[in-house]
Structure formats: C-alpha cells, structure tokens
A protein has these predicted regions:
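HDAC/HDAC-like amidohydrolase catalytic core signature
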Residues: 1-309
C-alpha cells in the first residue's frame, strides 16, 4: 500500500503578518519537496468538508463561536498575542482539521496504509476554550476524538515530538483514559507546561522534558521511554503531532536533532507499533521554523512512513 499526503492550497490564505515565524512559506517548502518523491509511493488528497459538529467533542461551543466571529473582513486580528487570523484563515483552519479527518478515513478504508497531513495553522497548543501559540483548533485532538466517536476505538496514542509541549492536547485529554498523550519537549520553555509530574487522571499522560542543548543521542535515548509506554498502552491507532523544531537549525528552540534523527525515531515507533495497531498511523504537521530543516525533516519522516508500507 501507499502513503497518503493530505494538503490544501487554502493554507496560503492564512496570513499571519510580516515577520511571523508561522508563515505561508513553511508548508510551501514542505509540499515543493514532496513533489520530488516518486508519485507511485504517495496518494495526494485534498481535505474533504466535514460536519462542524465534530469540533464539539474537542472544543467548547462558546470557543467555536468565538473563533468563527474572529475572522476579519480585511487585515489581521489576534486571538492571543501571537495567534493571528486573516480573512483567509477561516478556510485554512477548516482544511487543517479536515485533513486529519480525510487521512483517518483513508487509512480506515484502506485507500493508503498511513498518511501525513501538511497543514497550517498547527494545533497542539489550542486548548478546549483557548487559542494559543499559533494554534486555533487542535487538529490532532479532533482526529483522536473522531477515531473514538466514528470508528469506536478505545485506545488512541498521540506522540508529540514538537520541541514545545502540546499543552492543548494534554488539556483536552488529561481525564480521558482512551487517549495516551506522550510529549518530548524542551523544558523549561514555552508554553511552561509539560513537567514529568503531569501524568493525567489515568496515568495517560507521559511528559519527557529535555534541557536546552540536549543532543540527538540524549534525545533518542530518552525516546526509548516513549516506546516503553507505547508497549504498555497497546494503542489501536497512532497519531503523530509532528513538529520539527527540535532540529539543531531551528531558530525557536535549542535542541540538537538532525533531519536523519526524525527518520530514525519515526521508523523505530512504527516498528514498535506494528504489532499493536497494524500500522494504523496518521501524522500531522505542527511546528518547524527553519525552512531547509523543515523540508529535510518532513521528507525523512515521510520516507519512514513510505518504507513501512
């Protein structure tokens, strides 16, 4: 089978303003690089429209109304100090969520074995009632809830290797025994959450805080704890919150991974998860702000997905 690549041109209309690190060029760089991959190995898909009621399982109706009213007719508006929306953000946010829904449906219907969603805005900082850190809707959380509600899964694992802790995803699933959330991240650092003492009501949260300057070897050694927890939980479906800002060249953090390290951690995770979830894996883009590093790292991440087929 092949790997799905789900993306939409609407990300280009999500304007965050001059000088903002979460810019249009991020996804353009990723997609341009994927176009060089042998097309026989990829299934390109556009996100399907989805029922907005799907958001209710993840975000409050009050927050959804707030977001819908926030998109300006022109110019820019702010949901928080660094989360910016423009007129085109409305469709971009819908397509970011729609991408993970489409990817999950494609895996479930055996259209492809696994999938990567190249989207913006990212999602893992968005809480149930709050936009934060460039994130509006929590894309991966909507995906996890969709798996539970539509496909009746009882064990979903989310692995978040973005350099920033996914406070939003943790907030949404802190008391949900059906979802295991694991995060490797620089700590202490933005957003301030993510200590190893935050474990969830059902021991369903695993935070692996890493000091600034953590090397690739140290990171990959720590990542063995991710795999150990995965084996204990035995997920039926695996989601990646795939941020690539732990790369040594990323301007927003101080971890020291290479693009090749993202290949190895992805491959290792897929090997471990095979016996549990039969390769049911969907990955969605989060952070990564050096364009060349982001290009190379997403390519190697998807290479691992393709090889697993």
């Amino acid at each position: 089978m092949k790997t799905g690549l789900v993306t939409s041109d609407t990300y280009q209309n999500h304007n965050t303003g001059e000088g903002h690190p979460e810019k249009i060029d991020r996804v353009t760089a990723v997609i341009d690089n994927f176009k060089k991959i042998d097309n026989k190995k990829l299934v390109w898909k556009k996100p399907a429209k989805f029922d907005q009621s799907l958001l209710i399982n993840t975000h409050s109706s009050k927050y959804i109304d707030l977001v819908n009213k926030s998109f300006p007719e022109n110019g820019l508006a702010f949901l928080d100090g660094d989360t910016v929306v423009s007129p085109g953000s409305k469709e971009a946010t819908k397509d970011a969520v729609g991408s993970i829904i489409t990817a999950i449906d494609g895996v479930q219907q055996k259209e492809f074995k696994n999938a990567f969603c190249a989207v913006r805005p990212p999602g893992h900082h968005a809480e149930k009632d709050k936009a934060m850190g460039f994130c509006i809707y929590n894309n991966v959380a909507v995906g996890a809830n969709y798996l539970i509600e539509k496909y009746k899964y009882n064990k979903i694992a989310i692995i978040d290797f973005d350099v920033h802790h996914g406070n939003g995803t943790q907030d949404i699933f802190y008391n949900n025994e059906k979802v295991l959330y694991i995060s490797t991240h620089q700590y202490p650092y933005y957003p301030g959450s993510g200590s190893d003492k935050e474990t969830g009501k059902f021991n369903n949260i695993l935070n692996i805080p890493l000091e600034a300057g953590t090397t690739a070897e140290q990171f990959l050694n720590a990542y063995e704890n991710v795999l150990k927890k995965l084996k204990e939980f035995k997920p039926e479906f695996l989601l990646f919150s795939a941020g690539f800002d732990a790369h040594i060249d990323d301007p927003l953090a101080q971890l020291r991974l290479s693009s090749e390290d993202f290949y190895h951690l992805t491959k290792r995770t897929l090997e471990v998860s095979k016996s549990m979830c039969n390769g049911n894996v969907v990955s969605i883009l989060e952070g990564g702000y050096d364009l060349r590093a982001l290009q190379d790292s997403t390519k190697r991440h998807v290479d691992a997905l393709i090889e697993f087929n």
